[in-house]
Amino acid sequence: EFRMGTDSQALTAEDLRAINISKALAADAVEKAGSGHPGTAISLAGVAYLLYQYEMTHDPADARWLGRDRLILSSGHASLLLYIQLVLAGYGLEISDLEQLRQWGARTPGHPEFGHTPGVETTTGPLGAGFTNAVGMAMAARFEHGLLDPAAPAGGSVFDHYVYTIMGDGCLQE
């Protein structure tokens, strides 16, 4: 039995099914595209699913909501990991978008592009770029809290969101 969180909540059969479907979608999308990087999307499917379904505070109906938590995929070549979770979380991406992975004009390009795909927080691709963006976002939120909402207690401000980052060894080596 797989357990998560400090309260040791067990994953449901539905959670495990969604994670397994995420893995299958990753393999299928790369096969259809004829290129891509399925490894990270398969190996981290559970982590990304848990972040979007249980850990992160976000609103797919308002992808730019100021108080949302952010997930930065520094390993931009693994964009499929992010796209699959955006489908499952209801950000307006569909399976048909996954079928267009890495195709010209698709909403699912080979690397995440800010402003192109709903739910993508920053453009990544060059190794280390997402990591530095995430640090900057976290520092900006702390600064904005102090400047724009100084009376709010810790955890009580729209600026008290989290910035999560998925990165690989290449990002750390840069």
Predicted regions and their residues:
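Short, Lys/Arg-enriched N-terminal segments with co-localized hydrophobic residues
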Residues: 1-3
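A domain-level signal for the structural core that forms small-molecule/cofactor-binding pockets
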Residues: 9
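N-terminal capping segment at the start of a domain
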Residues: 21-35
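Cofactor-binding active-site loop characterized by glycine-rich and histidine/acidic residues
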Residues: 43-174
